[in-house]
Structures are given as structure tokens and as C-alpha cells.
């Protein structure tokens, strides 16, 4: 099988040296992502496209899906590459390929040509289109808005019969821009802002301020791992978790109520800037949107920025909440965000929307900054690829099984879409569906006299959720890995 990768248009307008660098990086990213599917896979770069050739037909859908999620790719063409002799040969091959698709439909033919030939692209379009129209009685030519467009590409003595076109996510290849550190909370905003910077070519590391205990961190790990695995797995990234509960405690004890929100954000920026400096990261990324909450007015954002020289990027600054939620739905983080607790907004009962710098600084003089230094020093830094392994170590008390007993029930915790695409059926045992994002509120409604075997495709989510349920006091859970 063969795929032709078309570049994001902004790449094609770069200077020759920059364009070549971007294509080289994108080629490497594709190899890094796809090597897990087919070790014999070949990735070949050209001036205006990249070829991907693989032998394992069983991996066709997986490879195609992975390609659509790699930043820098505008669209993918799934093609059949065959030799040809003349225009009539092109027509005959097109007839075999497209006859069934054109029955009873309107169509047109579009041709792209590279190389030296005694015919033009328009000549091929007319010849092939006329031939298809004559040989398929129920088909009809329609040059504007046809039901089917027959795409052909002619390159030297090769004909590419395009079997399907699949849109990518666009953007720049990861690694073409410098690294950033995303302040991730697991909510709608931080997930979308992280995705937007990945799409713009940055390797995104994650910094999480834990305000809610182990269960909160587990949830945010899920989001970060999901984003990395889905859009950024071509590169290794860090997940840095900082226990911010001592900082919040100090703020609650010593800081005036109205100033708490801004000061908490200033502490987060100070801490994240230290982490960024430690790892040579150039900028911070937040999901803040203008006016969304009290700390996100222009006055307050300016005061928050003043505590650090590190550049702070806010890709969602002009977005409304509905737009952000729609983007979260598109990239798959909506379900995570809907069940993620939000702690920042509850520590201040009457937050200021226009903080005064002198008052903020006066309040911060009451704060013991050794606490901030200590939590940053003790920050837990892991390679995001190790999250699954680390979860295995944390859930030592949760048994992983590959079989089942008479009192067991498999609990499929995948999202509804995944369950509909690939329903789970296991002979000899009941399978119950309960998406991961409903476990916190619905698991208690299940029959607690049964033993529930949590299952998901890769096993990462099931382990994380098993730990979460154990934290909540449910001891009748195991992880099912057949």
C-alpha cells in the first residue's frame, strides 16, 4: 500500500532551505510515529510530497489514521501506483478502479501531471472523462459540484489512482519551533491550548499544579498522555507534577480574600518559569481567555505576567467558551474536561477584577516563598511515555488478570465512539459499558457484590481508573488484559 502525504500550504511558501528543513523534520516525525505499526515501512521525501509505503495490509487503517493526526500534513492520498503506456491505458485502468463508484452518479475527472509527456493534464481529463461517460451508461459528466471526483496523478511513466483523500490537521511539524511548557489543569482550555501549540510545531511539555490530591493528578495525566499519544508521540516530552497544596494553604491563611486568585496565578507562573528554565524551555502556554474569569482581565493578566521574564503564550485569548468546547470535542478531550474538578475558582469568594500592583505586592510580602521553592524543588518529573509504567507501579494492589471467574463482569470504559466503532464481545462473561468519564459518578450504582474487570484498548486508562476507584474505597476492581 502507498500513501502520498501533501504538505501544509504554509510549508510550501517557505524559502528553499527552510522548506527542506521542515520536510526533513516531518519525514522523521512520520517514521517515529509509524515504526510501531510496520517495521518494514518506508518513508521517502520529495520536494512537494512525502511517500509512505508499507507491506502489512492489516495495518492500513491504523497507519492512515495515525497520518491524519501528525502536525504538518494537509491531507493524505491513498493511492494505487501502476505503470501506464498511453492515455487509453490510463482510461482503462481508471474504468476498472472507478466503475462501481460512478454507477448512477455525476462525475468529473481531475488530473495532476509531472514529467514530460506528449499530452497535457486537460487532454487526460477529457479523454478519460469521455471514455468513462461512454462506458458507464448511468453516469453523467458534471464539471461543477459533481457527486464523485475522479482524481488521477501522472508522474513520468507512473499512474496514481487515488482511492481516497483524508484530511490532516495541518500546521507545522513538531520540532520546527522551540519547546514550550503547558500549564495543564485537565479542563477544556488547557487541553485545547496545548493542542494548538503542538499543531504549530512546538514540542509541548506539561506542568501540572496539583491542588486536589492523587485523584486529580491521575485525571490530568490521562489528558496529557492522550494529547501526546494522539498528536505528539513523535517526540519525547516531560510531565512535571508540582504539589501546590502547601502553596494554596499558605495563600488561604495569609492573603486577603480578594487578591487570592491573582496571587495564586502569579505563584503558578513563578513556579512554571523555574521549571522552564531548568529544562531550557522558551515559553509557557496557558488556556486563559480574555474576561472568562476574574483573573483573566487585562489588568490582572498584566500583573500575572510581570512576575516572570518567560514568554507566556495564550492561544485562546480571544476565544469564547463555546468555541473552545467545540475544539475540545474535535480533538477528543471534551469527555476528560467535563469530569475534571476545577480548584482555582473556589479559593476566593469575592475576587478582584482589577488588581492593584502595590496591593498585590504588599499581600505577597506576607507569603513564605520558601514554600514555593520547596514544592518546585520536589516536583515530580517523568517521561510521559512512562506514565503507563508508573501507573502499574502505583496500582500494585490492583490485580491485573487475563481470565475471569463466575462473579466477574468486564467493564468497558472506552468512550462511546470507540465502543460503537469496535464493540467488545467476550464469550462466557457479561460485558457492561460505562465510559471512563462517568466512573466517578456512576460506578457506585453498579452491583458492588460483583468483581469489575476494567478494560480499555491499550490498558493505560484502565490502570489509571483502577487507581482512582481504589482511592475512592472501591476494592472490587481489577484490570483486565487478555
Swiss-Prot record:
Belongs to the ThiI family. InterPro entries: Rhodanese-like_dom, Rhodanese-like_dom_sf, Rossmann-like_a/b/a_fold, ThiI_AANH, ThiI_fer, ThiI_N, THII_Thiazole_biosynth_dom, THUMP_dom. Catalyzes the ATP-dependent transfer of a sulfur to tRNA to produce 4-thiouridine in position 8 of tRNAs, which functions as a near-UV photosensor. Also catalyzes the transfer of sulfur to the sulfur carrier protein ThiS, forming ThiS-thiocarboxylate. This is a step in the synthesis of thiazole, in the thiamine biosynthesis pathway. The sulfur is donated as persulfide by IscS. Keywords: ATP-binding, Cytoplasm, Disulfide bond, Nucleotide-binding, Redox-active center, RNA-binding, Thiamine biosynthesis, Transferase, tRNA-binding. Pfam families: ThiI (PF02568), ThiI_fer (PF22025), THUMP (PF02926). ATP binds at residues 183-184, 265, 287, 296. This is tRNA sulfurtransferase. It is an enzyme of class 2 (transferase). Residues 404-482 form the Rhodanese domain. It is found in: Cytoplasm. GO terms for cellular component: cytosol. The keyword Cytoplasm applies. The gene is thiI. It comes from the Bacteria. Disulfide bonds join 344-456. Residues 61-165 form the THUMP domain. The keyword rRNA-binding does not apply. GO terms for biological process: thiamine biosynthetic process; thiamine diphosphate biosynthetic process; thiazole biosynthetic process; tRNA 4-thiouridine biosynthesis. GO terms for molecular function: ATP binding; CCA tRNA nucleotidyltransferase activity; tRNA binding; tRNA-uracil-4 sulfurtransferase activity. It catalyses: [ThiI sulfur-carrier protein]-S-sulfanyl-L-cysteine + a uridine in tRNA + 2 reduced [2Fe-2S]-[ferredoxin] + ATP + H(+) = [ThiI sulfur-carrier protein]-L-cysteine + a 4-thiouridine in tRNA + 2 oxidized [2Fe-2S]-[ferredoxin] + AMP + diphosphate; [ThiS sulfur-carrier protein]-C-terminal Gly-Gly-AMP + S-sulfanyl-L-cysteinyl-[cysteine desulfurase] + AH2 = [ThiS sulfur-carrier protein]-C-terminal-Gly-aminoethanethioate + L-cysteinyl-[cysteine desulfurase] + A + AMP + 2 H(+). Gene3D superfamilies: 3.30.2130.30, HUPs (3.40.50.620), Rhodanese-like domain (3.40.250.10).
Amino acid at each position: 500500500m502507498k500513501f502520498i502525504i501533501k504538505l501544509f500550504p504554509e510549508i510550501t511558501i517557505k524559502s528553499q532551505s527552510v522548506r527542506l528543513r521542515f520536510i526533513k523534520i516531518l519525514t522523521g516525525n512520520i517514521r517515529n510515529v509509524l515504526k510501531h505499526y510496520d517495521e518494514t515501512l518506508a518513508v521517502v521525501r520529495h520536494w512537494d510530497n512525502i511517500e509512505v509505503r508499507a507491506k502489512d495490509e492489516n495495518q492500513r487503517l491504523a497507519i492512515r489514521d495515525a497520518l491524519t493526526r501528525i502536525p504538518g500534513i494537509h491531507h493524505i492520498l491513498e493511492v494505487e501506483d501502476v505503470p501506464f503506456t498511453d492515455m487509453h491505458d490510463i482510461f482503462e485502468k481508471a474504468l476498472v478502479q472507478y466503475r462501481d463508484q460512478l454507477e448512477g452518479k455525476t462525475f468529473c475527472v481531475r488530473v495532476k501531471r509531472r514529467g514530460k509527456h506528449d499530452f497535457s493534464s486537460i487532454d487526460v481529463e477529457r479523454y478519460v472523462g469521455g471514455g468513462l461517460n461512454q462506458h458507464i451508461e448511468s453516469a453523467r459528466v458534471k464539471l461543477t459540484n459533481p457527486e464523485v471526483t475522479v482524481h488521477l496523478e501522472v508522474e513520468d511513466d507512473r499512474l496514481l489512482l487515488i482511492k481516497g483523500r483524508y484530511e490532516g490537521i495541518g500546521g507545522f511539524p513538531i520540532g520546527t519551533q522551540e519547546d514550550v511548557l503547558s500549564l495543564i489543569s485537565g479542563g477544556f482550555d488547557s487541553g485545547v491550548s496545548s493542542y494548538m501549540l503542538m499543531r504549530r510545531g512546538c514540542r509541548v511539555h506539561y506542568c501540572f499544579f496539583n491542588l486536589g490530591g492523587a485523584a486529580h493528578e491521575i485525571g490530568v495525566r490521562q489528558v496529557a498522555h492522550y494529547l501526546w499519544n494522539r498528536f505528539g508521540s513523535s517526540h519525547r516530552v516531560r510531565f512535571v507534577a508540582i504539589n501546590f497544596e502547601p502553596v494554596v494553604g499558605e495563600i488561604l491563611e495569609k492573603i486577603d480574600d480578594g487578591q487570592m486568585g491573582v496571587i495564586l496565578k502569579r505563584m503558578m507562573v513563578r513556579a512554571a518559569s523555574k521549571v522552564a528554565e531548568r529544562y531550557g524551555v522558551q515559553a509557557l502556554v496557558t488556556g486563559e481567555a480574555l474576561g472568562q474569569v476574574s483573573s483573566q482581565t487585562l489588568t490582572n493578566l498584566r500583573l500575572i505576567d510581570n512576575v516572570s521574564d518567560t514568554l507566556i503564550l495564550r492561544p485562546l485569548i480571544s476565544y469564547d467558551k463555546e468555541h473552545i468546547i467545540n475544539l475540545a470535542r474535535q480533538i477528543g478531550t471534551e469527555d476528560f474536561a467535563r469530569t475534571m474538578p476545577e480548584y482555582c475558582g473556589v479559593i476566593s469568594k469575592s475576587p478582584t477584577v482589577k488588581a492593584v500592583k502595590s496591593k498585590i505586592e504588599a499581600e505577597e510580602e506576607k507569603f513564605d516563598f520558601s514554600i514555593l521553592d520547596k514544592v518546585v524543588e520536589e516536583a515530580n518529573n517523568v517521561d510521559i511515555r512512562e506514565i503507563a509504567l508508573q501507573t502499574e507501579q502505583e496500582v500494585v494492589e490492583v490485580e491485573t488478570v487475563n481470565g475471569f471467574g463466575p462473579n466477574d463482569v468486564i467493564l468497558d470504559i472506552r468512550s462511546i465512539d470507540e465502543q460503537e466503532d469496535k464493540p467488545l464481545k467476550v464469550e462466557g462473561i457479561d460485558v457492561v459499558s460505562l465510559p471512563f468519564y462517568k466512573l466517578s459518578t456512576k460506578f457506585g450504582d453498579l452491583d458492588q457484590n460483583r468483581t469489575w474487570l476494567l478494560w480499555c484498548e491499550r490498558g493505560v486508562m484502565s490502570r489509571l481508573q483502577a487507581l482512582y476507584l481504589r482511592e475512592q474505597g472501591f476494592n472490587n476492581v481489577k484490570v483486565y488484559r487478555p
